[in-house]
Design a protein with these regions (language model features):
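Short acidic-glycine loop/turn motifs at beta-strand connectors
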Residues: 1-4, 159
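ATP-dependent adenylate-handling active sites, centered on carboxylate activation for C-N bond formation
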Residues: 15-199
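Predominantly a core beta-strand signature of beta-propeller blades
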Residues: 4-8, 106-107
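Short beta->alpha transition motifs characteristic of CBS
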Residues: 9-14
Length: 199
């Protein structure tokens, strides 16, 4: 174009779904290899940076997979960051520490208390673009603040559960819709209000 910009579609969900339906993978081994290849390619593309790069590590499957592939393709230890909680029932830092040790990353932990979490709640509307019902936004913000002093780019496993259906709500949503989708909207609204009042 005359100003040096070209407008082009980078990615299309509709095209991806259409292509996937036409070229279904029926072999588990092929699916695993394609997934690994796609993840490695994505990580390599995201790792092209002229600034220090690291990752957020929770010890869960998603972030552990990302960090594992990063470390596998890195010539030096990847810097990993995790948030730990003083309350044992919320603390997953021990899992992250074990994964970091196994992978040989340069691991940094920050522990937070309930008061640390409460202190940033008032700032959340300014930090995030839109409201969302995920309490992980608090530790995510804190780990970002922690990592900022060490690096400018960090990869994470965020979105893995949504992408791979890791939450039961995604499994049940379609089943529930198949049962009640035919009902008129006013009746669905009444049912929704009743369901949300159940403790």
């Amino acid at each position: 174009s005359e100003n040096g910009f070209i407008l082009d579609r980078w990615w299309s969900l509709e095209s991806l779904v259409s292509d996937s339906r036409q070229n279904q993978i029926t072999d588990e081994r092929t699916a695993i290899e394609m997934l690994e290849t796609g993840l490695i390619e994505s990580i390599k593309l995201q790792s092209i940076a002229d600034v220090p790069l690291g990752a957020f590590l929770s010890g869960g499957i998603d972030s552990s997979s990302i960090v594992s592939l990063m470390q596998q393709h890195s010539s030096r230890p990847v810097k990993t960051f995790t948030i730990g909680f003083e309350e044992d029932r919320y603390n997953e830092a021990v899992y992250a520490k074990n994964i970091a040790k196994h992978l040989g990353t340069e691991h940094i932990e920050l522990y937070m208390s309930s008061s640390d979490a409460l202190s940033i709640i008032a700032d959340l509307p300014q930090i995030y673009d839109e409201p969302f019902a995920d309490s992980s936004q608090i530790p995510t913000h804190l780990v970002c603040c922690q990592a900022r002093s060490e690096m400018k780019v960090a990869l994470s496993g965020d979105g893995g559960d949504e992408l791979f259906g890791g939450y039961n709500r995604y499994f049940w949503a379609q089943r529930i819709w198949n049962k009640v989708g035919w009902l008129p909207k006013p009746l669905r609204s009444i049912l929704s209000n009743i369901i949300t009042t159940i403790p």
